[in-house]
Amino acid sequence: KGDQLYIGLVGNVDLYSEDFDTHVAHLARDRRFVGVRARGSKPIDFSHDLVLANLNMLAQRKLTMDYLTNGGGIPGIQTADKLARSIPGLTIVIDHCLGYDFDGKEPDEDWISAVESLASNQNVYCKISGLYQRCTIQPAVQNLGHYRMVLDVLWKHFGAERLIYGSNWPCTKHSGSYASFLQLVDSWISPKGQAAREAYYWQNAAAAYRLPLK
């Protein structure tokens, strides 16, 4: 409270809680509370009536849901796709490049098709984060070529307006340095022009989380 070093915070609120809206309402008294990260002690069933009711409440409050598909592969993407279609008013930010395991190989066509379907939902954003953590080689490869094919698929389908920069700090320092990660992603986005850089680094986040930035 009173700390102006951050302008937005995504919180943890149990999606299975009967008091979900009460907790969210309390947190939302601080306008820097911008949404909820879908996580918990057990896997979340996004077809569960209470979970869906709580996410509808989140949408009505114009708050965002962060979603982790880590390890979920194509089924995880399809779950997010179905959710985005069932609650079109809910803004969803999917973290860590949709949970892709970066092995340096060309992504599978089935994965690309799942991404294309997901990205057709205009209420879904993709966060370019966690590259080092999701690299199958550790310490992580610090060469853009290892990641480019996947990043290019995300760019093709989400476009300049729905990709968001994420540092994943401090986790990044366990697999590589923050400086090298920033240099890597900047070498990917910079050739697309300054407008794309501005969108990627802050404007898209401002839109997704409704931040007071101009």
Tell me what each language-model feature is.
Residues 13, 40, 97, 168-169:
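Active-site metal-binding loops of divalent metal-dependent hydrolases
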Residues 9, 27, 58, 96, ...:
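Conserved, mostly hydrophobic/aromatic
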Residues 152-153, 157-164, 173-214:
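Mid-to-C-terminal alpha-helical segments outside catalytic/metal-binding sites
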Residues 10-14, 127-130, 164-166, 201-202:
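Short beta-strand segments
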Residues 22-27, 107-110, 214:
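Short, surface-exposed amphipathic charged segments that create phosphate/polyanion-binding patches used
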Residues 131-133, 169-172:
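Short Gly/Pro-enriched loop/turn and capping motifs at secondary-structure junctions
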Residues 34, 45-164:
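Catalytic pocket-lining loop regions of alpha/beta-barrel enzymes
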Residues 1-61, 67, 86, 145, ...:
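Mid-domain alpha/beta scaffold segments of enzyme catalytic cores
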